[in-house]
């Protein structure tokens, strides 16, 4: 399935809209854009981490230049972000989880593999549903948004067919990879 927002090079977004794109429709490019921005802001706060990113000229919390970085530069920022994901996994005591990419797709350049267990996934969801913003986004049925110029418009629909608060199902996350197939 096409699980991309299909953002245009140079396009800029409100980050919250990308959270909807990620959580409602599993847009892989949204996960990467979020990862690049989160890594950039981490670098702004932590000068000691900047040795990997000589392509960044300004750490003034203005991430607009990220819409113009190349694939190799993106991979560096994504790697910084996945390190953060793995640190968070350790923080919430996920004993059998390791992340390679922010979108869950395999990385053809990396010989390591994502892995987790049903138990760790349950612990992850238990952690996430304590965040009101997360719950609000994941329970949204549909959302429309545009890039910051208003030129491009996007319609999102929640792909989770199991979501039904009347039956006690308040949250969940769908997904797909070639190796795993469709997942809930």
Predicted feature descriptions by range:
Residues 16, 28, 115:
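Glycine-rich phosphate-binding loop at the start of an alpha helix
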Residues 1-24:
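Signal peptide-directed extracytoplasmic domains
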Residues 36-184:
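Penicillin-recognizing serine hydrolase domain
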Residues 1, 5, 26, 69, ...:
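Extracytoplasmic/periplasmic mature domains of Sec-exported, cell-envelope-associated bacterial proteins
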Residues 28-29, 83:
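A generic alpha-helix surface/boundary motif
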Residues 3-4, 31-35, 46:
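Short, conserved acidic/polar surface loops in the N-terminal third of protein domains
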Residues 14, 20-23, 30-33, 96-101, ...:
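Structural recognition of the beta-strand scaffold that forms the well-ordered cores
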Residues 25-26, 178:
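Short flexible coil/turn linkers enriched for glycine and charged/polar residues
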